[in-house]
Amino acid sequence: MTDEKHVYVPPPKDPPSYEEVALHSALNNSAPPNDGEQNETSMEEMEIIEPPSEDSSRFPLLRTKLAAIHEGWESACHSFEIRFASTFHRIPFQFLYLAVIATVIILASYYGYFDGVPAWRSVHHYGEDVLLNYIKGCDISDTRQQVMTLSSIPHLAGTVGDSSLLQMIMNRLYYEKGTIVDFREFYAYLNFPQLVSLSIDGDDSFHPSLIESYQVGGYDGVSIPTPATFGGSPSGFVNAPLVYANRGRIEDFEWLVNSGIYVESSIVLVRANQSDFALATANAEKYNASAILIFEDTYLTSLDNLNQVYPAGPYPSANSLYRGSVANHYYYVGDPLTPGWSAHEETNRISPKDANVLPSIVSIPITFNDGIELLKRLQGHGHLVKDSNWCQDLAPVLSEVWTGSKISSPGLEVNVLQDIEDKQKIINIMAQIDGYESDQILVVGAPRDSWCTGASDSSVGTSLLIDVISTFANMAQDLSWKPRRTIVFASWDARQFNAIGSTEFLEYWKESLEAKAVAYINVDVAVSGDTFTARTVPGLKKVIQRAFDVANEEDEMKAANIITDDFDYTSDLTSFLTFAGIPVVNLAFERNEENPTPMPFLGSCEDTVSWIDTFGSEYWENAARLGKIWSYLILFLANDPVVPYDLEDEINGVGEMLKRIPEIPGANALDLRKINEEFSELLESLIRFEDEIREWKSLMMHNSYTVSVKKHPELEGYNAKLARFERSFLDEAGLPGHEWYKHLIYGPNLRNSHSQLFPSIFDALLYGDVEAAQKEVKRIALALDRAHNEIRFA
């Protein structure tokens, strides 16, 4: 990172206190301990004993051998002088002098003498067991109390609450010695609701709940109103008939059209979970709807647990509002007006009309109760739906499901007034612990902002991030320790608005991070179940399992669930993986099918500590476990001499993914021979590369944590190749139709919100364009060739 872009400015060191000066003076003037007096006396006696003289009769045999060696040396020097003296006399002395100096400089530079650590001195690293024991001994702070503080007020990005939380965290981190703490500002497109209203023409009995009020703790009668809103929604006034479109998928809109129900110029009602808000909105816009109303149907999980509905238990009520972003992340994430470059205050921006991530239709979230009330108003209008995909799970709360129609449906009036800021300041908090290898960086992050109070949706992750920073800062201070690689910690702002904070950071530092970053570790919704789950690339599976196993020694858990083909592309890891090709990990405790616990109330003002408490102590115990696993993983990725990116796992994982290309609908028309050939060559290169690393380890790494970083240029070469390997699958031309995404293996797709392997092939075949799909096959083959060349000349 160049000097003019250096984010982290260390604060000036404080002068020593009087106590420190007095202690230093006392130590210098104190007498040595009694148990060392005998050793010191012996040393003094040894120092004054004179060495034996040349006439001494000691060691006669040794003296005879040394004399013979001396005579041989004298003879060799005399012979060399006779043969070559005349030649050297003809070379000017200055040239010989310069040649010697140049040789010394080249060798010194090669072995790192001019780098941060002298070549003659090993970089001291504590044994792994010492560092692990230190982390094990670190007490996690009272996470519940810390989360209660962090979630005490709503803190949407760009608001006063977010600013207060920022200051609170900055003040907390400034006390951590050994870290450099600073912040980085960006200026992004954000919207803030001023007015939201919804009514039915001629029906005064419909009173939707469009505002949630959060009761401020410790202040009786003081509450903060939070309107229903979606990030990215424009202002607008619409009066139009209502049409129901099930879950807002493409197939749902196609079914309506095939049934003679057209949604053009209508208000569409859909039920969708938070990950599908943006896709449902994009599909409604594609079919020319004028507005969209979205309700979450997670309340259906409460029907069998009505005695456990919050606040009596963890299940959602029918009156919860779930906010989210409707920015279409299929095209890109980050600031809508600066795609591909960082959003500084004076940078060039595109028009909001040209930002294809921003929808042009009005959208608002509504409660489950209000959604059902609107469906009841549609009964008798349009078509009676009998498709089980549309109505089966609604049967307990709705006798019939009708589509509604443009002709006969009741008219709705939707009014949304947004305060839209093109350049709203957002702030990432950064902390850094410098490592010995300044050319390698590990990035660690968690989002900070939330739609409301966000206890589970950001505050738990933020609390754990603070604890992790504290652990490593204290370890650096107490042990005078430095990690091998620099660790950059980040508290991201504006994650809820399409992952803006992390993306702008990545876009600003892209060139440097592509060259230096070994991995990015993300924690978002830290706990939503009881199974430790890591979503990552195949090359990091082993090191994640290793971190989990260490934590499992202290506190036995269920088996870890490590997933390598499914990412959330609305999260902060998106830009690192798909835009810059940096290996990523997302850590969390998630739900599983065996124990489908209720999901957190993401985006709702009911996402509070009191809701978390309905789970009992297990939630907080899992949060503490996650903090330990996170710390161990950071240690391994930042401190192992060889970057723990397992190339064999990575390549074998890619091979398994390649086998799934024929499973894509329409892929039987593709010629995949070139991909298979390139992958076979990649496997051959892998064998040679792994052999070289094994040979190096056997020769040099007798103690893996006491190895000179600068004595082994081979190690630097291996690590650089391992860190760059994931970048082989980037293509700067981008994916057709959403060129911001560069990774050919991972990315979003047009059809649904789920992660899609080889998305460009999927999208091309979705439209029946076999020729375009074959071009994507060729690009993937070229990426495999780049990967092969990356490790071929190890």
Swiss-Prot record:
Q: Which family does it belong to?
A: Belongs to the peptidase M28 family. M28B subfamily.
How this chain sits in the membrane, per its record, is: Single-pass membrane protein
Where are its TM segments located?
A: 91-111
According to the record, the residues making up region (Disordered) are: 1-56
Question: What Gene3D superfamilies does its record include?
Answer: 3.50.30.30, Transferrin receptor-like, dimerisation domain (1.20.930.40), Zn peptidases (3.40.630.10)
Keyword terms? Membrane, Transmembrane, Transmembrane helix
Molecular function via GO: carboxypeptidase activity
Gene Ontology cellular-component terms listed: fungal-type vacuole membrane
Q: List the subcellular locations.
A: Membrane
Q: GO terms for biological process?
A: protein transport to vacuole involved in ubiquitin-dependent protein catabolic process via the multivesicular body sorting pathway
Q: What is this protein called?
A: Inactive zinc metalloprotease C354.09c
Cross-referenced InterPro entries: PA_dom_sf (IPR046450), Peptidase_M28 (IPR007484), Peptidase_M28B (IPR039373), TFR-like_dimer_dom (IPR007365), TFR-like_dimer_dom_sf (IPR036757)
Source species: Schizosaccharomyces pombe (strain 972 / ATCC 24843) (Fission yeast)
